[in-house]
């Protein structure tokens, strides 16, 4: 405290304006110089420091606002993406169900088509068998008829002689003549 009062006393004892000198007493001059420098810094630096702090505050607030806007935009995009995902999942489920039903429908169509083809082949087989049976029966009939005819001709040829042959022809001619007279 004594040093502080000494420094104020020394201010009173300073020489007049014509002289300039350095006070080498550090303890006496330092608090005064520091108080003057701090006073000047506070007086002039207050506005600069206030401006710097205001600018910094505005940048931080602007960054926070931008971040908030980006966050809101990201949330909106996320919701849109989730909605699209739900829609795509529903469509995929629908395609899956439709695909299964389409597969079942195609399977039934194929089974029905195969059944119809088998039925048609069975009918064709039956018709072919029936046709072959009829042909075989006709061939057997023809063969039996030919053999019977040959046997009858053989019997007739062995039994017929010229005289019997002439009598048969005459009798037939007589019958035709009688029929002709009846119709005229």
From Swiss-Prot:
The gene is atpF. This is ATP synthase subunit b, chloroplastic. It is a single-pass membrane protein. Its main location: plastid. F(1)F(0) ATP synthase produces ATP from ADP in the presence of a proton or sodium gradient. F-type ATPases consist of two structural domains, F(1) containing the extramembraneous catalytic core and F(0) containing the membrane proton channel, linked together by a central stalk and a peripheral stalk. During catalysis, ATP synthesis in the catalytic domain of F(1) is coupled via a rotary mechanism of the central stalk subunits to proton translocation. Keywords: ATP synthesis, CF(0), Chloroplast, Hydrogen ion transport, Ion transport, Membrane, Plastid, Thylakoid, Transmembrane, Transmembrane helix, Transport. InterPro entries: ATP_synth_b/b'su_bac/chlpt. In plastids the F-type ATPase is also known as CF(1)CF(0). Belongs to the ATPase B chain family. It is found in: Plastid, Chloroplast thylakoid membrane. GO terms for cellular component: chloroplast thylakoid membrane; proton-transporting ATP synthase complex. The keyword Metal-binding does not apply. GO terms for molecular function: proton-transporting ATP synthase activity, rotational mechanism.
